[in-house]
Amino acid sequence: MFSFVDLRLLLLLGATALLTHGQEDIPEVSCIHNGLRVPNGETWKPDVCLICICHNGTAVCDGVLCKEDLDCPNPQKREGECCPFCPEEYVSPDAEVIGVEGPKGDPGPQGPRGPVGPPGQDGIPGQPGLPGPPGPPGPPGPPGLGGNFASQMSYGYDEKSAGVSVPGPMGPSGPRGLPGPPGAPGPQGFQGPPGEPGEPGASGPMGPRGPPGPPGKNGDDGEAGKPGRPGERGPPGPQGARGLPGTAGLPGMKGHRGFSGLDGAKGDTGPAGPKGEPGSPGENGAPGQMGPRGLPGERGRPGPPGSAGARGNDGAVGAAGPPGPTGPTGPPGFPGAAGAKGEAGPQGARGSEGPQGVRGEPGPPGPAGAAGPAGNPGADGQPGAKGANGAPGIAGAPGFPGARGPSGPQGPSGAPGPKGNSGEPGAPGNKGDTGAKGEPGPAGVQGPPGPAGEEGKRGARGEPGPSGLPGPPGERGGPGSRGFPGADGVAGPKGPAGERGSPGPAGPKGSPGEAGRPGEAGLPGAKGLTGSPGSPGPDGKTGPPGPAGQDGRPGPAGPPGARGQAGVMGFPGPKGTAGEPGKAGERGVPGPPGAVGPAGKDGEAGAQGAPGPAGPAGERGEQGPAGSPGFQGLPGPAGPPGEAGKPGEQGVPGDLGAPGPSGARGERGFPGERGVQGPPGPAGPRGNNGAPGNDGAKGDTGAPGAPGSQGAPGLQGMPGERGAAGLPGPKGDRGDAGPKGADGSPGKDGVRGLTGPIGPPGPAGAPGDKGETGPSGPAGPTGARGAPGDRGEPGPPGPAGFAGPPGADGQPGAKGEPGDTGVKGDAGPPGPAGPAGPPGPIGNVGAPGPKGSRGAAGPPGATGFPGAAGRVGPPGPSGNAGPPGPPGPVGKEGGKGPRGETGPAGRPGEVGPPGPPGPAGEKGSPGADGPAGSPGTPGPQGIAGQRGVVGLPGQRGERGFPGLPGPSGEPGKQGPSGASGERGPPGPMGPPGLAGPPGESGREGSPGAEGSPGRDGAPGAKGDRGETGPAGPPGAPGAPGAPGPVGPAGKNGDRGETGPAGPAGPIGPAGARGPAGPQGPRGDKGETGEQGDRGIKGHRGFSGLQGPPGSPGSPGEQGPSGASGPAGPRGPPGSAGSPGKDGLNGLPGPIGPPGPRGRTGDSGPAGPPGPPGPPGPPGPPSGGYDFSFLPQPPQEKSQDGGRYYRADDANVVRDRDLEVDTTLKSLSQQIENIRSPEGSRKNPARTCRDLKMCHSDWKSGEYWIDPNQGCNLDAIKVYCNMETGQTCVFPTQPSVPQKNWYISPNPKEKKHVWFGESMTDGFQFEYGSEGSDPADVAIQLTFLRLMSTEASQNITYHCKNSVAYMDQQTGNLKKSLLLQGSNEIELRGEGNSRFTYSTLVDGCTSHTGTWGKTVIEYKTTKTSRLPIIDVAPLDIGAPDQEFGMDIGPACFV
């Protein structure tokens, strides 16, 4: 319900917006009242009858005014409220019984012309609210429409009659007859000519409610009624369609600091901050668990030459060779772990002021202007000739009784006419006895709203309304400024074991430790050299299958799981203090015009601006999709107030307000024409006979009085509630670099770098334990000392040193040449406002704007202070009938009527002839109240009223337009160091390292306890300059440099086109009152006046109350991205951060040179039997057996050394012995291969994870696997990452050439096109090693997926003028690629998070004409989705759009 208070609130809001424009912030103060501290601008109620506001440190309090004389016997008072009230069912005893409806009066004289109202279109009706409580009784209603003719009146009214009799023609009046019984109502007669105005009849009873009439024209604005009680809250209306954009208003003042918002979710990753100083070394940790076997130590100092030993072990890797030339770009690496989110970057530079936006569409007409000063009354015009009878007008209010006409001559007696109307009231009879109290009459028709009463005191603060329904989610906020450091977190879990430190200095020798427990069995020794092959033995019989192997060891921990869902939003953080403003940065390039914002709140009507040139209408862009909600950013600083929106359309008429109290009696109006004869009133008590007066002449209707002058402005109202935050302004100028932050904690793990070249040999280690004495070799001759070697190739560059201190600022550069004349600039923004000009002429009424859709109902705001009096609103629709109003003032005494018949009410006998006037009687009891007098003609405008009480805060405004860019904020304080991140998962294998020098073989020592980390070594000498490496990835943005010197002024550009009209200034102060001119006829439509100067800055208003949050508006369309500003000068280097953790392992190094010969291997298996020996010597002469071949028990002192199944002499070795030996060795080898497969073609493993578990020290590389087991002929070759246990299957064709693959038949119709399915020469991706059967690979992949819990794959999309993921122009992902998984599921860039991929690098965001690349990564636990078999780009099809791809391996673990 739009009440009087609402109107005042709207005006007060508008006034506050003007007053606060341009004023500086007042420092926040608070008030202390009765020990209670209250923030500035806050209101509170110390008790129910007192309301206070804190205004700049002073508590301003006012009592709640209550109506003093309540018209009911038992006023009631609610708990917690100050004012008593009448119960709703109470009816005032003064309510009079209303008589029969009076006759219809003639139309009143034409009123003065009202100001032209804005013809608004009706809005869509909202859903009806719940009914409010009944209002107080209204004033008396106007007289009802009368009956039609005397013939009708003669039939009377009978409740029970149903028939209708037709009236006869009107005859001459006969003598007055007795009152007849009530007749049936007659039918509606035709409209007769209007009669002379009759005496006003008494009020009739309330008629039945008629059908609703057609909507009338908008009447003149009526006085605003007193605010009614608020109704119960209606259900929220439906979300309206988005309104048309309004004209941008002037930028508003910077608003007060907003209250702290809730802590947002973590913002987007900012660029990396400057590297902090290295942290101090931590304390020594507790000794870790025993580590794996260490690498061989450096070569010891040369000992004296010993005798030549046996061949040593393979040597260590040789020193680094010179770096090789940069190789071609490899296929995409294996997916790394997702990096931790970086800290928020510094605030960007402020962009330059953008050009003036395009002219908005014409707004709806503004509200009517304030009434101008009244002219003096014009001279009386000549009386015009009588016009023809007009069509019957709407019944006017009854006029005052006209002067009585002279009696006409007596006419001839006519035939008796039908029964006449009841006669005029007779001379008053003597006072009769008091009649019995009548039944209460029915409620009368609701009267029109009474005139506005005097302004009441401030009402009690209402209770807060119920919470509204949650609004739709708002748009994603821009990244907020960096928050204050949070409280220290709880101690994190123990981090992983650090890397092994460099050796510390040797400690003092410890006391001997206790004897250790027996060590575990050592790892199997390295495989010995293969023995020379024996001659082939006979094929053995197939042995029985061996026993099943033991279960393998448990695998290593899997990689970190997928990122969890976002946690619950935390509690709001404490309010941050404002940073000092930073220096202004350089002006950026103008950005493109922003998208039109949502319509703002109605602004004050400004002076008419000069018409600007009409711009061409642009096509409406398509609605962008709603982005997925981002994590909520930290609260941004309060933006400047949004620009004022264009005026809204005429709203739907509000519900009828509760009738106001009866106004003071108006001055007497001029007499109206004679009305139709009214029905008889009830007989009054008999009065004294008065002497007849002389008839006065009828006067002419006077001209309407001149309107009064405009009242003095009211007191400054309280400011309205804080408006919703405007849309983020354009990017501000870039602030200066902030002060150097405190040293950061060690950064999170970096992405694992490529394997660096092998470093120079470290310092000599402590002497190792003495090795076991080798077998003495023959002493070699001492060699001569070698000549010094040539200087080696320059080593690789050393690690980057710590950054030096920033250099001194350079001298300003020489003044540059003047630039070429620029192209004609866009129209600039409006200049600053000039001083207030005189008021311009009233402009034409604007065309009605298009009808806006109804917005959603906002939640109720807190009750504000009363607003200033609003302008008169248009009349509302007729209300329902109200109860009878209070009695009107007593009417002026009418002229004496002719003597009537004896009324039925008199008890005395018939009335005698009139006697002489008697003495004055006693004062009679009050007569029944007369009917309400007709409204007089409007009097002159009264003098201005006193200033009203400070108004309540206005309703919350709609969301403003984006404000102008705010000044750059000062760099935030350095945040606390973040906790060290956990170590990331191992990266992919690096390239082979260079071969190292051979080390001497040492005896394998027992593992020592882990030493404490040594101190950092001294920096090495600077190496020679290396060759230029390939370009690295773009670095983090440097801190902004100091601003350069101001350049010379450029030449003047061409004169720009006329800019659009500036926004209207506020209404100037009223001029001095001029002499009144005569009222002229309505002039022709004037031309649009020139634009007035902008008004002066108003006073600052009080702080408004904090309003509840408004419903979020519907998201606007995605604006185009602004042009990038020029890169700032390079900032000084930051201090070096603490060293990050070790990067991931590099790729395998190249194969080193062959090591020295290994130790002699174990004895090989016995060879096959040799050829038969030569014949033996002759046997003994006897013919007996040689018992030496039979099994003999071993003898302690056997002379011939006979053995059990063994013979010392080679000649007597049995073939059977060799066969058994060979078979046993072969079987044990096969069993060992089953239990610990080698990953070779003949002995494939099941997965790389199995290989890693059995051979944890093996290097990453290519191995053979057979996931389905069985025959090994279908084994496939894969890449095993031995650090992670991943099994990676490469595509058979890993790259797609970079060229134009597709020309679209319809370039405007963009759709996804599958590379393998729909493009000429395209193909679906197949996987496996070279020469493998695709069917075998498919089966093996099926088994591999079953044995894996996670899969990942990267694809690199090379692009030229083709968007792969994010479209920089629209900021959305609609043009992202589609990927097809092995199970034919489509993976997208946006949508359901279960089927979306992410990007590691996104260099294909716009059409630049150069090649870029986007690296796509997809990780999933649904292993059946990988590998990817097809890709569908969308942004292709034009001749200049080209692409290519690198397909990475699919890795399973």
From Swiss-Prot:
Modified residues (4-hydroxyproline): 179, 182, 185, 194, 197, 200, 215, 230, 236, 245, 251, 278, 281, 287, 296, 302, 323, 332, 335, 362, 365, 377, 383, 392, 398, 401, 416, 425, 428, 440, 449, 464, 470, 479, 485, 503, 512, 518, 524, 533, 536, 545, 554, 560, 572, 581, 590, 593, 611, 629, 635, 641, 647, 653, 659, 671, 680, 692, 704, 707, 713, 719, 728, 746, 761, 767, 788, 794, 797, 806, 812, 830, 839, 848, 860, 866, 875, 884, 887, 908, 917, 926, 935, 953, 962, 965, 971, 986, 992, 998, 1007, 1013, 1034, 1037, 1040, 1109, 1112, 1115, 1133, 1148, 1154, 1169, 1172, 1175, 1178, 1181
Record PTM text: Contains mostly 4-hydroxyproline. Proline residues at the third position of the tripeptide repeating unit (G-X-Y) are hydroxylated in some or all of the chains. Contains 3-hydroxyproline at a few sites. This modification occurs on the first proline residue in the sequence motif Gly-Pro-Hyp, where Hyp is 4-hydroxyproline.
InterPro entries the UniProt entry points to: Collagen, Collagen_superfamily, Fib_collagen_C, VWF_dom
Signal peptide: 1-22
UniProt biased composition (Gly residues): 474-483
3-hydroxyproline: modified positions: 874, 1153, 1168, 1171, 1174
PROSITE patterns: NC1_FIB, VWFC_1, VWFC_2
Propeptide: 23-151, 1208-1453
Region (Nonhelical region (N-terminal)): 152-167
Keywords: Calcium, Collagen, Disulfide bond, Extracellular matrix, Glycoprotein, Hydroxylation, Metal-binding, Phosphoprotein, Pyrrolidone carboxylic acid, Repeat, Secreted, Signal
GO cellular component term, pick one: extracellular matrix
Glycosylation sites: 56, 254, 1097, 1354
Biased composition (Low complexity): 187-206, 307-320, 335-361, 368-418, 527-566, 623-650, 685-695, 703-716, 773-787, 800-815, 842-872, 901-910, 920-935, 997-1012, 1067-1081, 1102-1148
Positions of transmembrane segments: none
Stretches for region Major antigenic determinant (of neutral salt-extracted rat skin collagen): 1176-1186
Modified residues (Allysine): 160, 1197
Protein name, per record: Collagen alpha-1(I) chain
Organism, as annotated: Rattus norvegicus
Taxonomic path: Eukaryota, Metazoa, Chordata, Craniata, Vertebrata
Name of the coding gene: Col1a1
